[in-house]
Amino acid sequence: MVTAEEIESAYTAWAQANDDVRAAFVVGSRARVDHPADAWADLDIIMFARDADRYHETIDWIRAFAPLWIALAGRTAGGDPERLVLFAGGLQVDFVFHPDTHLAGLPQFLATGPLPDDIVRGTRVLVDKEGVLAQLPPPGRPSAPQPPDSATFRQALEGFWFAAVYAAKQLRRGELWPFQNASSGMTGGLLQMVAWHACALSGGDCDTWHGGKFVAEWAREGVYADLQGVFSRLEVEDGRRAMRVRMALYSRLAREVAAELDLSYPTELEQQITATVERIMDGKDKA
């Protein structure tokens, strides 16, 4: 199995010899100091080239590094072109492509901020033919997220409870796969509340990462243990159990956040929706 170090070395030599490639750096766990890469980590490379589209649209240049299994073309969440590459043996390498013209704006981008978390957490320069990547910041910790204001908090609450009613209907129908899909609206909202709770009860001294990474470390004491019951098997009864765990935990955390941040809490709305969800799950509401 090819290693990340071998791919990085081969890529760097290729990029240094290729005049079209002007800059490249590593982000993610293989550039971080805090929670660095483990044996299963992928390699994330951001590259700048004069003809960036060519590298997105072709894979011949990737094949030169190691035996290749898969090279999926797509776009990042931010809309940047990328290739998700799987080399023989299982190593994943993600290439993100930018035109070299973006390098001219990098100093201003770094100076004005706020910077993306993956840049703040650490970068490692591979190629810097234009001499601009030296301005990348040293590894650090992102600023704590801003606490929710009243409108943001209320919107989050309504999103969770809306998802609860929708998921309950799928469960009542016995549509267990759609129920699992619908449950993501609840679990996603719950994760957001876990993060707000961690920050609110620590006075803002928190690092909640992204997408639930390391949640066992940053959630407040006891919360991670409570999260163990929020997912269910493809069974109606276990779905009911998970629904009740999610609603009870969300309610408790949200109320504690509201109290800590001096936000109003819609107790009556929660009670009405909780009762409705119970009626639906128990079959007391007709479809």
Regions found by a protein language model. Name each.
Residues 1-19, 27-40, 46-106:
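Metal-dependent nucleotidyltransferase catalytic core
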Residues 143-287:
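Conserved nucleotidyltransferase catalytic core and NTase-mimicking acidic/glycine-rich helix/loop elements
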Residues 26-27, 181:
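Short loop/turn and capping residues at structural boundaries
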Residues 7-10, 57, 138-144, 227-228:
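Short amphipathic alpha-helical segments, especially helix-boundary/capping motifs
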Residues 64-173, 178, 183, 189:
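Conserved NTP/Mg2+-binding pocket subregion across the NTase superfamily
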Residues 37, 62, 122-124, 130, ...:
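Generic secondary-structure boundary/loop-capping signal
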